[in-house]
């Protein structure tokens, strides 16, 4: 009998820790060395966000937005899963993206949760474009500073790379270079991509 209380306490602590750590905003800083980076891009900061799903990070995303402002990014990239596949109300997330766009030019790539429902994905793409967010869906865009530019690419992968028809995630195919080339085209190797 005496072992049940410590076991329960340990399980409760571990469960609470996992819940909290999964909901905390985490900031990682990396410095990248890019050989063909044009001089006007040296020292520029990119803020990468991803997998927001149902998280809010404060009322109206205020903690998230304040962290983004504090980072002083030159560009914001959102790498998919702005919402979860079962969410239907896009208004709060669109308001967040508008706020991010006012911090720095913002670029968006769809994740697997967005592409689970292509009607929602198309509506989201239209609304994001209307508010000035750049959408990367199997295309390249140039980011320019002065006379310098870099090329950025974004894919919208088919669902077969995210899950099987039975919604399982085992033995998923790896995307191959020729498939990426088919989606994005061949990069200009003389430029910064």
Task: Please annotate each region the language model reported.
Residues 1-40:
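N-terminal membrane-anchoring alpha-helices
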Residues 41-42, 72, 102, 148, ...:
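Residue-level preference for short coil/turn positions at secondary-structure junctions
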Residues 33-37, 63-71, 141-144:
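Short amphipathic alpha-helices and their capping/turn segments at secondary-structure boundaries
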Residues 27-29, 49, 152:
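Hydrophobic residues on conserved beta-strands that form the core of alpha/beta folds
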Residues 27, 43-45, 149:
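Short, mixed charged/polar active-site loops
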Residues 44-134:
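Membrane-embedded segments
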Residues 27-34, 93-95, 135-140:
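Alpha-helical scaffolding within the catalytic cores
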Residues 36, 54, 114-193:
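Conserved catalytic scaffold of divalent metal-dependent phosphoesterases
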């Amino acid at each position: 009998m005496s072992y049940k209380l410590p076991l329960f306490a340990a399980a409760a602590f571990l469960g609470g820790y996992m819940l909290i750590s999964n909901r905390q905003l985490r900031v990682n800083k990396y410095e990248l060395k890019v050989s063909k980076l044009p001089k006007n891009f040296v020292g520029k900061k990119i803020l990468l966000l991803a997998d927001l799903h149902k998280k809010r990070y404060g009322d109206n995303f205020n903690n998230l937005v304040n962290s983004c402002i504090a980072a002083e990014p030159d560009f914001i990239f959102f790498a998919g899963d702005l919402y979860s596949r079962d969410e239907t109300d896009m208004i709060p997330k669109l308001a967040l993206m508008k706020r991010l766009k006012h911090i720095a030019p913002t670029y968006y790539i769809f994740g697997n949760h967005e592409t689970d429902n292509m009607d929602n994905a198309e509506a989201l793409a239209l609304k994001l474009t209307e508010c000035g967010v750049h959408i990367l869906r199997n295309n390249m865009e140039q980011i320019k500073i002065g006379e310098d530019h870099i090329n950025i690419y974004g894919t919208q992968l088919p669902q077969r790379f995210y899950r099987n028809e039975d919604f399982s995630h085992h033995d998923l195919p790896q995307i191959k270079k020729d498939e990426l080339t088919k989606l994005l085209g061949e990069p200009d190797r003389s430029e910064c991509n």
